[in-house]
Amino acid sequence: FVKNFIAIPDIISLLNMSSGFLAIIFAINENLVISSSLIILAVMFDSVDGWVARKTNRKDELEFGKNIDSLSDIISFGIAPAIFIYKSINATSNLLNLSSIIVCLLIVICGVLRLTRYNVIANKTKAKDFIGFPIPGIAIIIATFYLSGLFNTYIVLILSILISLLMISDVKYPKFSNTMLLYMCFICSTLLIFQIPIKIYTINIPAIIVLFCCLYYLLINVIKH
């Protein structure tokens, strides 16, 4: 049954999901560097599955591909970052532990709402912009923030709340079109996945570049809105 529906883009979506699942396992085992690299890998798989679907003229009348993509995204970009954040905080007080649980739950809830709304809108219109911050954004921001060497517990909690709320907001985010910027982020992400260190003191340069590009995309559209 499944082989009649699954196509190359779906395999890429499953690779996205697999990367997210492995990121969860490594985060639980407190190997956060590998976990963050796997989250970035999941984002890269997610960024190409749609492109492959268009290039292969994939027909998806039953919406099998769209559903498998959304289910993969909630694992890789909702649950994985939430568990990653919880394990990275290493709470030293009951209040901080409770705060981190609430924030992580907020990420998952807003992620599910964001993906559900996207699927509903995608069925009815061909929007030029994303409505609300795209869910892969929170994953790559958290992962690169951790790898950057600038990670801070309180900043990551505040940032997670902000991004979660922006995911379910009405702020419009344009779909990526700056090819040069995309190539730069792709190269830097590849360096991070393969753990190729390019540092100044303790600052990971590729991580900083990707992080700042994502934060710029996050905030500039809020200002414009």
Where are these regions (language model features)?
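Multi-pass membrane catalytic core of lipid/isoprenoid biosynthesis enzymes
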Residues: P9-L14, K55-R114
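Active-site His/Glu-centered metal-binding helix of metallohydrolases
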Residues: S18, M44-V52, L71, I75
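Helix-coil boundary and interhelical linker segments in multi-pass alpha-helical membrane proteins
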Residues: L22-L38, P81-V103, T144-L157, Q195-I205
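Alpha-helical transmembrane segments of multi-pass membrane proteins
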Residues: I39-D46, L106-R114, I163-D170, C213-Y217
